[in-house]
Amino acid sequence: MIKTELNYGDVYLVPKKTVVDSRKECDTSVQFGPRRFAMPVYPSNMKSVVSAETCELFAREGWFYTLHRFNVDAVAFTRYMQEQGLFASISVGVNDDTYEQLDALKAAGLSPEYMTLDIANAWCVKAERMIKHIKQHFPNTFLIGGNVATAEAARDLEAWGCDAIKAGIAGGRVCITKNKTGFHRPMVSTVRDCVAAVTIPVIADGGIVEHGDIAKALVCGATMVMAGSLFAGYDESAGDIVEIAGKHYKEYFGSASQFNKGAYVNVEGKKILVEYKGSMGKLLRELQEDLQSSVSYAGGTTLAALREVEMIQVYR
């Protein structure tokens, strides 16, 4: 029998009695690894979304971030961030160049506070080898592994040594994996299954369309939420500005796109133009205000209240 699964657009949250006088009383901070952050959402570690400058901005604002892994000097970035009194959070792959990158970090006496193993399907033998290698050589680094889409995969990544996992395959706006391969799982079902399977934090990665989807992901049990298109198109975002018929746009492309790879090989991503939106400051304020409202509707004062909210399916 074919299973029916759910995405964020298929569900809503049932309001509870509000116990605060003002939404501003609601605390949106989250403990993630060794640090506490202002919000449980952060930009995708994509070359068209974050740059080193974007990451520094988020760190200074008290938000989590992860730098992408494409043509990055991890040694220079880690050293710079730590010299600034900020935390370093980098991404790595599973191929030979990553082992060389890790050797360079170790030779420099550097250990990033956070590291994300970032590949399309982390439920594989190469990821297992890399996770065990990282935990052996960087035991004090908080290691995030991704991406996965099933309970069994999540359990394996925890067993291999990950401190958190990233859940979601082919849910992003510029990801065409589901079109090219037929493989994908809706995010509500993915996150709930992965959360139930492990004892470590789960990051819901992909499928965020509206601000309210962040609250839905947290209700599903996610500790953190990663979003790409939500953070694209701003001054502080990566990507080039393009002018068409007097309007300004920024390029936004997937990590598996031809534009990121530099060649049309195993392409599972595309490039789109998103409207240029100016400064990101307004977005960060709105995201926090909207999540404070979500917490108030959940009948609490902290993000923990969202774990007790009823989720209902809507038929369209």
Swiss-Prot record:
GO molecular function: GMP reductase activity
Enzyme Commission (EC) number: 1.7.1.7
Enzyme class: oxidoreductase
Active-site feature positions: C175
UniProt KW keywords: NADP, Oxidoreductase
Matches recorded under Pfam families: IMPDH (PF00478)
GO CC terms: cytosol; GMP reductase complex
Domain of life: Bacteria
CDD domains given in the database record: IMPDH
GO biological process: purine nucleotide metabolic process
Protein purpose: Catalyzes the irreversible NADPH-dependent deamination of GMP to IMP. It functions in the conversion of nucleobase, nucleoside and nucleotide derivatives of G to A nucleotides, and in maintaining the intracellular balance of A and G nucleotides.
Family matches, as PANTHER family: GMP REDUCTASE
Family: Belongs to the IMPDH/GMPR family. GuaC type 2 subfamily.
Classification via NCBIfam families: PRK05458.1
The protein's name: GMP reductase
Species this protein is from: Chromobacterium violaceum (strain ATCC 12472 / DSM 30191 / JCM 1249 / CCUG 213 / NBRC 12614 / NCIMB 9131 / NCTC 9757 / MK)
Lineage of origin: Bacteria, Pseudomonadati, Pseudomonadota, Betaproteobacteria, Neisseriales
This protein's encoding gene: guaC
